[in-house]
Design a protein with these regions (language model features):
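Hinge/cleft segment of the Venus flytrap/periplasmic-binding protein
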Residues: 19-23, 27, 37-38, 130-178
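Hydrophobic alpha-helical
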Residues: 35, 48, 52-117
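Short beta-strand elements in bilobed, periplasmic/extracellular small-molecule ligand-binding domains
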Residues: 13-20, 36-56, 159
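Hydrophobic alpha-helical segments within soluble ligand-binding/sensing domains
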Residues: 1-14, 59, 111-115, 130-147
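Local beta-strand N-terminus motif with an aromatic residue
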Residues: 13, 46, 72-73, 124
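Rossmann-fold dehydrogenase core element
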Residues: 121-128
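Solvent-exposed, acidic/flexible segments
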Residues: 24-28, 52, 56, 77-80, ...
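Short, solvent-exposed amphipathic alpha-helices that sit
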Residues: 1, 26-45, 62, 86-90
Length: 178
């Protein structure tokens, strides 16, 4: 998972701006729970945790407010790619380096093709993918149940992928970018 990847970076200090999606949505709940649990377990500091409702401009404003406050931070954990893009816009405007060998680690989610290209170029560090076939697979199960068919598999594990700037390839961008 994304937070495990972040832990493996061994940053020494973790001062995180956590930009959340629409509160109560499945993606927000899951991504926030993962971050909060890891931050508590590892003693990470969440400098700011605020909802941007999947909006790039709001994410940019949240990030700018932290920059203006003078608080130290070295991780942007944005719960979707658009919000990560907004956060990066604030960093760029303030001439704060980010990505591979930068001062701030950038993490997004959803594996939009343009976002994976940012990872490939080293401007972002990580982009996570929740399996895009989950919805269609769940719909298929519901239809089977509605038709009276029995579902034999009680547990289904869907693979999730994460793309790291140090290992991503152009083939990954072409295959997994949406």
């Amino acid at each position: 998972t994304a937070v495990n990847w972040l832990k493996e970076q061994n940053l020494g200090e973790y001062n995180i701006i956590h930009i959340q999606g629409v509160m109560g949505s499945a993606a927000q709940v899951g991504r926030t729970a993962a971050m909060n649990e890891m931050a508590e377990a590892e003693g990470w500091t969440i400098v700011k945790q605020q909802a941007a409702d999947w909006n790039a401009e709001t994410a940019q404003q949240i990030t700018q407010s932290v920059i203006d406050s003078g608080q130290d931070f070295n991780v942007i954990y944005a719960e979707n790619d658009d919000m990560a893009r907004g956060a990066v816009a604030a960093l760029d405007a303030a001439n704060i380096s980010h990505g591979v060998d930068g001062d701030v680690v950038i993490m997004g989610f959803d594996t939009n093709k343009w976002a994976l290209e940012e990872v490939l170029a080293g401007r972002w560090n990580y982009d996570g993918q929740c399996n895009p076939y989950q919805a269609s697979y769940i719909d298929e199960i519901i239809q089977k149940l509605e038709n009276g068919e029995e579902i034999t598999e009680k547990t289904i594990v869907m693979e999730e992928k994460g793309f790291d700037a140090k290992t991503i390839t152009q083939e990954d961008v072409d295959t997994y970018g949406i």
